[in-house]
């Protein structure tokens, strides 16, 4: 990487040297032409005493034209110089597109990554942005790899638009690698090959929340209310960190159960933070977890993340898959939020709760209060939704964590 940066530095210095040489030649010609004009004007002025009135007028016009020409030449030269200097500064500030592994963890080496990627890896799942794999390094470390979809939607690999997306993605990955929170997936390394990126994360043995909830529906896994509430609190604490604790506010843009990973203790970790805004395949992707303002007017704020969280909290409370119709009643509107609101207004909120976790009266009261929080998060108006900071306080009040 150091050698690559040296080559980039050498090419930048060569470019600057050529431009400086151009400036010297250009301005030497400009100064020569200006001095010639001055000599012409001087010669004309010495002969003007013996000139006729007509010749005097011609001489005056020549002098004016020479002065105007000199001023215009100076202005054009200044503009060209300013443009070139700005271009040089912009070029030097550009992030170089790195190739090969970029590692952020001392437990991983570029060599071990290359070797593991070349061998067989186990497919775990996929979404619009790419596929997830399980991979074992030569030191025995188990990691998860997400191979992002190709950047084919932004032109050829060497086009300026493709390079721009790669630079933005690279900057985003470097930003994500610096985030440290127990409820965020830590980026350990990434590899760029041609127009594809492979992201390396810690391996989560319980998979995604989507995987677990599917197993709950088929009765392969039991997930009590205490664990579900812990998952909800962990998700919103991750959002709180992104929204309020980072130097620059970070939005998730694609919060849904497939992007919530669960460790061995069912502690949630948010994955793919911010990547959806960069990947071309996600620009038009809208799911039932997307806030109405993001799908209707392409506006996205921290309150849009809160809407997505409200959908996840609704899934945890009801156990239902929001992509399936909830009931035949027209009053429900066919969406999770409208269905929950309808039951709340009709005094039948208990009917929405997952029957497999109903039992103790105290837990049932907590679930009903959480249902009210869900409905607020799913408001059509962003200003009516609570912030992630407020949600942490609201949810932790339901139970002692």
Curated annotation (Swiss-Prot):
Domain Protein kinase: 118-401
Signal peptide location: 1-33
Membrane-spanning residues: 63-83
GO molecular function: ATP binding; peptide receptor activity; receptor serine/threonine kinase binding; signaling receptor binding
Bilayer topology annotation: Single-pass type I membrane protein
Cytoplasmic side: 84-401
Subunit structure: Self-interacts. Parts of a tetrameric complex made of two CLV2/CRN heterodimers that can interact with CLV3 and CLE peptides. CLV2/CRN heterodimer interacts with CLV1 homodimers. Interacts with CLV1 and CLV2. CLV2/CRN heterodimer can interact with BAM3.
Short name of any one Pfam family annotated for the protein: Pkinase
Name of the protein in question: Inactive leucine-rich repeat receptor-like protein kinase CORYNE
Free-text note on domains in this protein's UniProt record: The protein kinase domain is predicted to be catalytically inactive.
Extracellular compartment residues: 34-62
Main subcellular localisation: membrane
Function: Involved in the perception of CLV3 and CLV3-like (CLE) peptides, that act as extracellular signals regulating meristem maintenance. Modulates root, shoot and flower apical meristem maintenance and floral organ development regulation, probably via CLAVATA (CLV)-like pathways involving at least CLV3 and CLE19. In complex with CLV2, perceives secreted CLV3-like effector proteins from plant-parasitic cyst nematodes as ligand mimics of the plant CLE signaling pathway. This recognition is required for proper feeding structure (syncytium) development and ultimately successful nematode infection.
Family the UniProt entry places it in: Belongs to the protein kinase superfamily. Ser/Thr protein kinase family.
Residues that bind ATP: 124-132, 146
Coiled coil segments of this chain: none
Subcellular location: Cell membrane; Endoplasmic reticulum membrane
Tissue: Present in roots, stems, leaves, inflorescence, flowers and siliques. Mostly expressed in shoot tips and, to a lesser extent, in young organs and roots. Also expressed in the inner tissues of the proximal root meristem. Expressed in the vascular cylinder of root tips, mostly in phloem poles.
Keywords: ATP-binding, Cell membrane, Endoplasmic reticulum, Membrane, Nucleotide-binding, Signal, Transmembrane, Transmembrane helix
Cellular component, GO annotation: endoplasmic reticulum membrane; plasma membrane
Phenotype of gene-disrupted mutants: Insensitivity to root growth regulation by root CLE peptides (e.g. CLE8, CLE9/CLE10, CLE11, CLE13, CLE14, CLE16, CLE17, CLE18, CLE20, CLE21, CLE25, CLE26, CLE40, CLE41/CLE44 and CLE45). Lower carpels production. Impaired interaction with CLV2. Reduced levels of BAM3, especially at later stages of protophloem development. Ectopic fruit organ initiation after floral meristem termination. Enhanced resistance to nematode infection. Enhanced disease resistance response to the bacterial pathogen Ralstonia solanacearum.
GO biological process, one term: regulation of flower development
PANTHER family the record matches: LEUCINE-RICH REPEAT RECEPTOR PROTEIN KINASE EMS1, LEUCINE-RICH REPEAT RECEPTOR-LIKE SERINE_THREONINE_TYROSINE-PROTEIN KINASE SOBIR1
